[in-house]
């Protein structure tokens, strides 16, 4: 019973730290991937997050699946936006 509780806590800590480390994630210095779209399977192609993110809002230019579950294949789908494009829209 105690080892089950300890492993549950360990998994929760790993997931939380992974989320903190990837949020926000910069890609090529122009894109920021900081909107959590939900869970994804990190073993599948990363393109599984691209279309759902683009359909969510026009400010998103894509998305990617970031592994957070280690060997379980659990991932976090994050949507990416162009920082320059977002700044231009806000100034209008």
Curated annotation (Swiss-Prot):
Domain of life: Eukaryota
GO cellular component: extracellular region
Residue pairs linked by disulfide bridges in the UniProt entry: 33-80, 40-65, 49-77, 53-79
Keyword set, alphabetical order: Antimicrobial, Disulfide bond, Fungicide, Plant defense, Secreted, Signal
The keyword Signal is assigned to this record: yes
Primary localization class, coarse: secreted
Pfam families (UniProt xref): AtDEF-like (PF25052)
Location in the cell: Secreted
First and last residue of the signal peptide: 1-29
Keyword Ribonucleoprotein in annotation: no
One of the GO biological process terms: killing of cells of another organism
Family in the record: Belongs to the DEFL family.
Protein's name in the database: Defensin-like protein 96
Annotated source species: Arabidopsis thaliana
Lineage of the species this protein comes from: Eukaryota, Viridiplantae, Streptophyta, Embryophyta, Tracheophyta
């Amino acid at each position: 019973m105690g080892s089950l509780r300890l492993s549950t806590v360990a998994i929760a800590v790993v997931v939380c730290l992974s989320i903190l480390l990837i949020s926000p994630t910069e890609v090529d210095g122009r894109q920021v991937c900081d909107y959590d779209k939900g869970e994804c399977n990190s073993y599948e192609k990363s393109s599984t997050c691209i279309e759902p993110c683009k359909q969510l809002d026009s400010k998103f230019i894509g998305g990617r699946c970031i592994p957070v579950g280690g060997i379980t294949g659990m991932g976090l789908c994050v949507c990416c936006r162009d920082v320059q494009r977002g700044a231009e829209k806000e100034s209008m």
